[in-house]
Amino acid sequence: MQEYFRIEDIMSRKLVHTPEGVRDIYGDEKAKKTVVEHLLHEKIKGYGYRDIQTPTFEFFDVFSKEVGTTPSKELYKFFDKEGNTLVLRPDFTPSIARCAAKYFMEENVPIRFCYQGNTFTNTSDLQGKLKEVTQMGAELIGDGSVQADAEMIAMTIEALYHAGLSDFQISVGNLEYFKGICAEAGLDEETELELREYISGKNYFGAEELLDRTHVNRKDKEQLLKVSELFGTSAILAEAKKAVSNNRSKNAIDRLEKVYQVLCDYGVEKYVSFDLGMLSKYNYYTGIIFKGYTYGVGDAIVKGGRYDNLLRRFGKNAPAIGFVIVVDDLLAAMSRQEVVISGIESYVKIYYTSEDFKEMLQEARQLRAAGKNVELLPRSRENGEVK
C-alpha cells in the first residue's frame, strides 16, 4: 500500500511539470506581458494595420521546404482523420501570405495586417530555447517601395520605444548585395544557400572550404568572405559599394541609402545600423532584411524583411514586407535591464461575513461598474477587519 502511494506521488509530481521548451506564465509576469503586448499593438494599429487571425495549425505544404520557411525536422507535424499532414505554425508570414492570396486576390491597393499569437519550433533541448513563443507582427502587402521598407523599420522602432525599451539597435541589410556577388561568382542556388548557412552561423572555415571546393576565383572569394565584415553606421554603405563591381550589389546599396534617408525623415536614424552580412535562415526573404537587438538576451528580439516572391507561391503576385517582435525575448530583456513596466492593473479586495455579504456585494458591484478589478473574499481570523 505504501508503495502504491509512493508511485502515485511520483506520478503526481511528474504531471505538474511542463515539457522541455514550454512554460507557464502567471502573476506579475503575465500582467507585464499583457501590458507590453497592448503597447506594441497600440503603436502598430496607429500606422493603420488591421488585426488578422490565422489558424494555429495549417497544411504541411504552407511551411514546406519549397516555401523557404522552417526546416522540416523543426516542425511539429501530426495527421488529421483524413490522413493530411498538418503543422503547428512555426512562423506567421507564410500563413498571412496564404490568407492574403485567398481573400485579397484582386486587391491592388496596399493591405496592412497585424497579428499576435504563439509559434512552435521543435528545436533541440540542448539549445535551451523556448519551443513555444509569443510573437507580435505586421505585414504590408502590395507595396514594393522604399517608403514601405522604411515604414516597417520605423514602426518597429517606435513600437519598441512605446513599450518601454530605449536601449536597442535595428540592424538593416539587403540580401540582394550578397546574391549579386554569388551570381557574379557563378554559384548555383544550392551552393548559395549552403554558403548563407555557413556565413550566418559564423562558420567562416566552412564557408572558405565550400568556396575552395567550388573553385571560386580569388576576387569573388574575398568579396564573399568580406561580406560579414561590412557592418556599422551608414558610413559602411559607401565602403560596401566600393567593394563590389556588379550592378545587382550596387543597386542593393542604393536601396539601403534611400531607405536610410526616409528613416532620417522619421527621426529614428540613431537606432539604425547596417550589416551586409545579415543572412536569414528563411529563404523566402528577397531584399531588405532587418533584426532588432538589445542587451540581456542573445537572440534578436525583432526579425523582419521583404519577401516579394512568397505570395506567388499561393497564387497572388504582390510584393510584401513584414516583421515580428518576439514578445518573450523582449520581456526577458526588459526584466534584465530593470525597465519599469507601468500600467499594470491593480486589484481591490473586499472581505465579507455572512451578516454583511449583501452590503459588500453591492460595494463590489459599484466598483466593478467603475472599471475596478474586485475580489470578494470571506473574512477570516487571519485577514481580520480589513476590507
Where are these regions (language model features)?
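TRNA-binding/sensing appendages of the translation machinery
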Residues: F5-P94, A150, S171
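Short, surface-exposed recognition loops or helix-turn segments adjacent to catalytic cores
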Residues: D167-E176, L195, S273-G277
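Short low-complexity, flexible loop/linker segments enriched in glycine and/or proline
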Residues: E66-T70, E184-G186, I288
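Acidic, His- and aromatic-enriched active-site or binding-groove loops in soluble protein domains
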Residues: E74-D80, L187-E208, V268, T294
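Positively charged, Gly/Ser-enriched RNA/tRNA-binding surfaces
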Residues: K32-K43, E58-F59, T93-M105, F113-L165, ...
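Internal, well-ordered alpha/beta segment that forms a basic, Gly-enriched binding/recognition surface
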Residues: A148, L160, D167-I170, C182-Y204
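Short, conserved phosphate-binding/catalytic loop or strand-edge motifs used
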Residues: K131-M136, V172-G180
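Short, glycine/charge-rich beta-strand/loop segments that flank catalytic centers
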Residues: T54-V62, I111-N122, Q169-F178
